[in-house]
Amino acid sequence: DEAGLGYNAWCLAHYGTDRYLNVRPFYPQNFYGGQSPLYTYLLALLIRTVGQGNLSLTLLKIPAVLASLLLFFVGTKSIRLVFDDQKWSIAAAFLLAVCPYYIMSARFALDCNLMLCCSAVALLFFIRFTQTKTLRNLILSGVFFGITMYSYALSYFLIPIFLICISLYLLYTKEISFRRVLLWAACVC
């Protein structure tokens, strides 16, 4: 997967096509299937800017490392917002630091690793919205849920189900108006 992702990103950075000569594909093809566009296009951007047109193993893993670092800070911030206690956020930071999946996700350049980071950022803004009721947090939550849809194919299925369930719950408890749910859905799209 890493090799196919890297080669597609290199081809996109140099020629604007994937390795099968599809011009700027929405859903790039990998060996025996597709791959999510977010990692591919992030890596193509890095190849054009930071890598000066060259692809290296280090450059291939930079998005995964940055996503893992962002997940660490977003995860601890989310726990602090939910529990309103620094002890819980320190415990969450410790658990993230020793979690084998978290450690391995920074080592492999797989597009599925971006889904966890993007959905955590979306949930952080959603938690902030439920606490502050500010429109800015609702819009940012919707935008990041929309970005999550481009991070991994499974999110095409999971994110809409989650958003429908949470919207129905918030409407039932009168925590959100129907107009704001529609705005949130528009931001996801």
Task: Name the predicted role of every residue range.
Residues A3-F31, L38-Y41, L45:
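Extracytosolic helix-loop segments that constitute the early lumenal/periplasmic catalytic or substrate-binding loops
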Residues H14-T17, G34, L38-L66, P100-Y101:
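Juxtamembrane segments of multi-pass membrane glycosylation machinery
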Residues T58-F83, V121, F125:
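Transmembrane-helix motifs of polytopic, lipid-linked glycan transferases
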Residues L60, Y101, R107-C112, L154:
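Short acidic/glycine- and proline-prone juxtamembrane loop motifs at membrane-interface regions
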Residues F83, A122-L140, T148, Y169-K174:
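Membrane-interface transmembrane helices that cradle and orient dolichyl/undecaprenyl
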Residues A92-A97, F145, M149, L163:
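Short helix- or helix-capping micro-motifs
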Residues L116, I139-V143, L154-Y172:
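Transmembrane-embedded, aromatic-rich helix segments that form part
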Residues V143-F144, I159, I166, E175-C189:
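Hydrophobic alpha-helical membrane-interfacial segments at the cytosolic entry of transmembrane helices
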